[in-house]
Regions:
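Helix-coil boundary and interhelical linker segments in multi-pass alpha-helical membrane proteins
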Residues: 18-34, 73-97, 133-148, 190-196
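C-terminal ends of transmembrane helices
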Residues: 46-56, 102-117, 159-167, 209-218
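Multi-pass membrane catalytic core of lipid/isoprenoid biosynthesis enzymes
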Residues: 4-9, 51-108
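Helical transmembrane-bundle signal
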Residues: 12, 16-19, 74-77, 99, ...
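C-terminal membrane-associated helical module and adjoining short loops/tails
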Residues: 120-220
Length: 220
């Protein structure tokens, strides 16, 4: 039974590998599904391990390796493929893998730092991956400068000192209402924008976290 979290972690990694394959053949719909499921498994492997008291150093290291694949290599490969469709010169094509390097650095820093249970310092790698995997589905003609700017900004956010809100499952009315509002809002976005809703949801999450932090600081 104690191996359940590790099995879920390996499922996360397997889905990341699957996403890479589907990105390579330009099947972004299936790649998006793989990353979304990988994020679900990533949530539940840690949740189950903490709830049942099954946390271990091995599990933490395995989780980081899986996250590098699903939430580091995948968005890096995706942006690289997107750059190739813009007829960008070769040195610039590989610029997308800066996301991979920034993600790996963040995960290593996360594993060796004291982490709060109330918030994340820097944008979580799953959130960043979900942001990028939704981009090809947005009804917007991407330009090279826009994509380049997005790569730089998100790579910074991954390792920034900014505080990001950490949603937690709690037995309280406030928590229930907040989760319900988030689910309804995401459902509305999904009905309107399809898979592109993932990108919009993460953008809203970033804005919400920054606003929440500013309001909290203003109250002392």
């Amino acid at each position: 039974m104690k191996s359940i979290p590790n099995v879920l972690t390996l499922a996360n990694a397997a889905l990341g590998c699957g996403a890479l394959f589907f990105i390579a053949i330009l099947d972004f719909d299936t790649a998006t599904l793989c990353v979304l499921l990988a994020a679900v498994f990533d949530f539940f492997d840690g949740f189950i391990a903490r709830t049942m008291g099954w946390t271990s150093r091995f599990g933490a290291e395995l989780d980081s390796l899986a996250d590098v694949i699903s939430f580091g290599v995948v968005p890096g490969a995706l942006t690289t493929v997107m750059l190739t469709t813009m007829n960008v010169d070769y040195p610039w094509i590989f610029f997308g893998f800066i996301i991979t390097l920034a993600s790996a650095y963040r995960l290593a820093k996360y594993n060796t730092s004291e982490n709060s249970q109330a918030y994340f310092r820097g944008l979580p790698t799953p959130a960043n991956a979900l942001l990028w995997i939704g981009v090809p589905h947005l009804d917007y003609d991407l330009t090279f400068p826009f994509l380049l700017g997005g790569i730089v900004v998100t790579s910074y956010l991954l390792n920034s000192p900014l505080i990001f809100y950490r949603f937690q499952l709690k037995n309280s009315a406030t928590s229930f209402v907040l989760v319900l509002l988030i689910m309804l809002s995401f459902l509305f976005l999904w009905m309107r924008f399809g898979h592109g809703a993932l990108s919009l949801a993460i953008i809203f999450y970033v804005l919400f976290s920054v606003t929440y932090r500013l309001v909290a600081k203003s109250k002392g």
